[in-house]
Amino acid sequence: MLKNLKDLTLEDMKVKRLTLKKEYMDLRFKTVVGHVENPLKKRELRRDIARLNTIIHEYAIGIRKV
């Protein structure tokens, strides 16, 4: 996943973050209802969202350049 993130533009990262958040919320709902095929997917999504947040924040504070 990390190799793919470095190739994305900042706007693409923001869109990807929104889609991952939506997917994470859907998975959380399915967990509450009681039917999840892969419970580890929730952890993977949460970590991918955190990675994206970190990279987006690095652009915002100037560590990474556009």
Swiss-Prot record:
It comes from the Bacteria. CDD domains: Ribosomal_L29_HIP. The keyword Ribosomal protein applies. Disulfide bonds: none annotated. The keyword Ribonucleoprotein applies. One of its GO terms (molecular function) is structural constituent of ribosome. Keywords: Ribonucleoprotein, Ribosomal protein. GO terms for cellular component: ribonucleoprotein complex; ribosome. GO terms for biological process: translation. Pfam families: Ribosomal_L29. Belongs to the universal ribosomal protein uL29 family. This is Large ribosomal subunit protein uL29. It comes from Borrelia recurrentis (strain A1).
